[in-house]
């Protein structure tokens, strides 16, 4: 027998290398075979409910790292709730209608307008479902636990029917109407867009300063006066029908030197404009308030059939321009709102494809709208005072990445103004994480216009509206309920397969159709109405879910998207928000803080991360970042996270190895019988349990990450395990000292494995497989630990905090001795502590082997007054380091004066000799194989 065989080195079957890319799929297969999600739901039956509603990602392409952040975050929350006494099902969803899928088919050469519509829609449907399958596999690879066999998909007939019922309820309350307001119009998509489908980019535009000649000055301005206006969209001058001034702003009539014309501009902008126009000097002829100029009539710059009226508007500012805004009600929301008050014509001179229409005039007809600036300049002639290129923020279609325009076209709207205050009241009742989300959503709802819900596309849910012979729109409850039932049975495809009369209830009549003839709407609903109705199609429809949901969790862009649309529909129909709380997260940027894009080559694919590092590394990254703000990720950052993971894994590996002979049923030592330092570690660990429990409640994953890393690296590795290994290795296998520490080891191991399961489910499942005494087959079926408190806990923590200060001081003294070549490693030291009475009292109270804790072979405690001059001194304490006396025990590696060669060929100290002689009589009788001496 070899001497080292008398040590309790533990069985280390748990591998140091995680090999996550290969092992994770094996665990996922095991979970699926064991129907783990289903079993967890069965365990939680009857418990309090926690229902997170999954915002549906768009079904197109593999998932990106933003999807991973979102889904992993949701999984962490739902797993933690499921293990903490809540019935917490997770139903994933997908958004499957809309333009992107039409664009994919177009790129494949499929031409919608040249084929049967039903056939085309079926192709869209099949493509969407294929993308659902692709993304489902991607999410499952990340270890996300969900009801994958029963997701909600917005193209499902049941979902479409429930969406129609939401529309019908809003229509019944009068919230759906048709109007010709200006809307965001995408010429590249040939469709209206909602605010949530807009993104802004900085672009260069040519802006023009020009003048309208006064035609009727109403006794205030004479006819040789010109009103100066500014535009950044020259094409809209073709539809200009008014000039808007600020009612309380001051305007001057000035006559430039050498000119026979006089001009009206805002007083606050005159100096800057004079420079732009080359007016070296000018004479001020008069001053007027904007309100005085109301109803003055001017000539259109070139269209002699058009007059432009001076009107008043509160949206006019002195930030730029001339203080006078040319007003084209067909091309702007403010223009429309102020223009309708004065009954200005709502002229639209651009068609759905962005081409100038015939009513723009023969010089413009057929030209692309943003190519007509040279024509406008030519038509203005000497009315043009200046032109300049400006850089400004401009709206783009978020899908096609092309600029859009405001354009008045007949559309269907959902009113927000009718119940805006009700929505705002509901926002104030909602909990927000982070708290600033409340202000953000509140302001968006407060300031938004009515919602354009119609789209001029094919792949989507039809608007269930019929038209009588006289043009009356029909959307009564009887009709929408019937359409909903048809969709539930057949899917929305039936809308395109049947005539209007066959979609109406049997025997339906209407006074507007004396001949019984009806037509149907051909527009579809905005896809935000699809997902915005999910509270009804999912949370309100499924027995195992509830409405309102406990939590909606999405990226911060969803304040104007899903959070917004869901809130509007829910309050409209039921008078309350669809959620009790909202958690929003920042965007994922690359390692340099830049937006990810294919062109930059900085995209991080979750699938690539899973192949290189493993999903648990990506999950740990999610827990490590502050998602209240934008977060960064790169392969280098993930490499750093992997290093942290390795430290956690290897620390837990040590605990597994050193509890391999520990049976918790027979070997556990009661808290009252633990050693003082073991009690301290138990208290510290339970504080960690409390911290993690609270952080899960607050959805603060980063707090969990920081607390776990600090505990593992500082409290365990750098302190407790640093000296505890000398006990568990060296003491007799069944000794009280060893079982005390193993009790703490095992308690930490089991509980931290449970606590980390929501974040690192694959790793903790592997650890759990080594814990043979735990009854649950999978850690995911276990319950979260509950933090305990202990008698005199605060006093114990205070005493050990003081010791930690002493320990740091002692380590400094030992380091100086190392540098002076007095010792090599700390076990070569004889440390003398010269202590004040206060420190002596502390050391006595600790009731511990201080030499063991400081990892020195010999320790002496003396009076502070006796400290030599060359001692390393601190307030109330000093240290002296000398080389320990004696020889190194081959078994404990400590220097001990009792170390000598024993008759059984072992060069050991008396303490090791006693352990050997009591526990290994055969080795004593036969002698050990070899000795270093």
Swiss-Prot record:
It comes from the Bacteria. The keyword Cytoplasm applies. Keywords: Aminoacyl-tRNA synthetase, ATP-binding, Cytoplasm, Ligase, Nucleotide-binding, Protein biosynthesis. It catalyses: tRNA(Ile) + L-isoleucine + ATP = L-isoleucyl-tRNA(Ile) + AMP + diphosphate. GO terms for biological process: isoleucyl-tRNA aminoacylation. Its EC number is 6.1.1.5. It is an enzyme of class 6 (ligase). A motif ('HIGH' region) lies at residues 57-67. It is found in: Cytoplasm. Belongs to the class-I aminoacyl-tRNA synthetase family. IleS type 1 subfamily. This is Isoleucine--tRNA ligase. It comes from Streptococcus pyogenes serotype M6 (strain ATCC BAA-946 / MGAS10394).
